[in-house]
């Protein structure tokens, strides 16, 4: 049985998940998820949130268990840092600055930009006085610009298998691109949101920092649990290991396979595996 992260109705209330927008700003398509009105504010039906969140987490778990990549998307100010932190924590990928049209549907061009970013990084790391200070400043400026745009996906290695979105109104272009490519969409839907094109809707407050933090953390926790399950299923002892990188998962599975032909059928957390070896994912650390 899948052991998904636990949460309660009280957790949702304490994070303000139930608070929607003013009634004048609502989207009628969200009517099935609205409990009522209080002080001219729509109140989200948390029973719907609980059911649909569990459904979304279950689907996410299955995708990651099959070694799928997850792309976190949230470019609004209050979501940006949380999106980056939680995607990085579980070894996944993110866009938290600005969605560039074609990031999914024109992946080949994005791949060229990623290659250019890596070239700038390599160039700036191996400078032997061959460039002037002015040239180096120009290179750094170009590197920083690319890093802001694609730093969170430069190690993704291909299209994601699912996207998780905060604020569907703001990220509508990303959702349309995912729909075109049949990439499943998990999204938090506020009372002013349009649920069209969302495969796994989660009714909830997408503006309050505590609510955003709650949703991003539980998504990240689910991803980590799926990765742990995958490694454990393959005979790898995950006791004592806190964080895992999807990128490195294949390495550890291969390592375990090699070990089976030698001494042991398992890889223990204390067998010279450093935590830094298990953490990867996004290029952007800060």
Swiss-Prot record:
GO terms for molecular function: structural constituent of ribosome. One of its GO terms (biological process) is translation. It comes from the Bacteria. Residues 257-286 are annotated as: Disordered. Keywords: Ribonucleoprotein, Ribosomal protein. InterPro entries: Ribosomal_uS2 (IPR001865), Ribosomal_uS2_bac/mit/plastid (IPR005706), Ribosomal_uS2_CS (IPR018130), Ribosomal_uS2_flav_dom_sf (IPR023591). Pfam families: Ribosomal_S2 (PF00318). Disulfide bonds: none annotated. GO terms for cellular component: cytosolic small ribosomal subunit. Belongs to the universal ribosomal protein uS2 family. NCBIfam families: rpsB_bact. This is Small ribosomal subunit protein uS2. The gene is rpsB.
